[in-house]
A protein has these predicted regions:
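Conserved catalytic or regulatory cores that recognize and/or transform ribose-phosphate-containing ligands
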Residues: 1-141
């Protein structure tokens, strides 16, 4: 199964966590597309002369990988979900690609203690709270 791992990737902690999740998923036999590894990090590649070109290349590469995935996992950790991840999970939903969430962070977005219902809907309201739940959800797909 090919998995697209959508997650924030803007600081050392996030990059490390994403890499750890990729290794964990690969140890379970999944093929994982992790944007920070495959497309690169835009802030490391661009300068004033190539910003638009680099952004377009990364966007188009990530979109193509979402389309070719069997499943998208959206890492919802953080005070609010990553904006890029929100777009990615919306694309997956629109294209009929299954998606599940992963969130160990107890902070939530709205007054009910839940994340935004539009994000939840794209995930079929399947959000794993730990690795054991995530593994169980993966086996059910």
């Amino acid at each position: 199964m090919k998995i697209y791992y959508a997650a924030p990737l803007f600081n050392d902690m996030e990059l490390k966590r994403n890499s750890e999740m990729k290794k964990w998923l690969e140890s379970k036999g999944y093929q994982v597309y992790l944007p920070q590894d495959e497309s690169g990090l835009s802030y490391e590649m661009m300068n004033e002369n190539n910003k638009l070109e680099i952004n377009r290349k990364i966007f188009e590469g990530d979109v193509e990988c979402i389309k070719n995935s069997d499943l998208l996992i959206f890492d919802l950790n953080g005070r609010v979900p990553d904006e890029g991840g929100c777009v990615e999970v919306g694309m997956a939903y629109a294209w009929g690609i299954k998606a599940i969430g992963f969130k160990t962070d107890t902070r939530a977005l709205d007054y009910t203690g839940d994340d935004n219902l539009m994000i939840g809907g794209c995930l079929n309201f399947k959000i794993a709270k730990n690795l054991e739940e995530l593994e169980k959800m993966l086996k059910e797909i």
